[in-house]
A protein has these predicted regions:
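Sec-dependent signal peptide recognition
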Residues: 1-3
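Cross-family detector of peptidyl-prolyl cis-trans isomerase
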Residues: 13-166
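C-terminal motif of bacterial Sec signal peptides marking the signal peptidase cleavage site
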Residues: 8-12
Length: 166
């Protein structure tokens, strides 16, 4: 009986979150579809999950970086980024750090970053559009980063600090 009450309570809470952010979710869905159909981005699919996608647009000549290393999901990378929402609201930036470098293991980021970074070469600069399903999903991360938020990153892959296979 207690388990039934807990499940019902959880379901009610999830429905409440979905109802509260319904317009925001629909706006994000619509905007993402517009970007997908715009022809400005390349659709990337995760090799580990065919339903996981991210959009990417390179800002550099990729022929100049094609021989540079690409990170593995277990690599530690140095990147610079600026994050905003679909409506232009700024969320975060590595440029607020002293050296403007964000160092992380690729697989310790949201799935959309994993998809994009493993396709980038050192030196590439891109805009990455991550649908909320490959971002933070239905989780509210802050008063700015609401549930169902698509993430738009301007990213430069600066270096692979550790190229680690396992």
């Amino acid at each position: 009986m207690l388990a039934l009450v807990a499940v019902t309570s959880l379901e009610s809470c999830l429905n409440s979150i979905e109802d509260e952010y319904k317009d925001w979710r629909l706006s994000n869905d619509s905007w993402y579809q517009q970007q997908l159909n715009s022809g400005q981005y390349t659709l990337l699919t995760a090799p580990w999950d065919p339903s996981a996608t991210t959009l990417i647009r390179w800002h550099n000549d990729t022929m100049l970086t094609k021989d540079n290393l690409k990170p593995l999901i277990t690599s530690t990378v140095d990147a610079k980024y600026y994050l905003r929402l679909y409506d232009g609201t700024p969320v975060d930036s590595s440029y607020t750090a002293t050296d403007s470098i964000y160092r992380s293991i690729v697989n310790q980021n949201v799935e959309g970053w994993m998809i994009a970074l493993t396709r980038m070469h050192v030196g590439d600069s891109c805009t990455i559009v991550i649908p909320y399903q490959q971002g933070y999903g239905s989780v509210k991360r802050s008063n700015v980063l609401l549930p169902y938020s698509n993430l738009i990153f301007d990213v430069k892959l600066v270096d692979i600090y550790k190229y680690k296979a396992n």
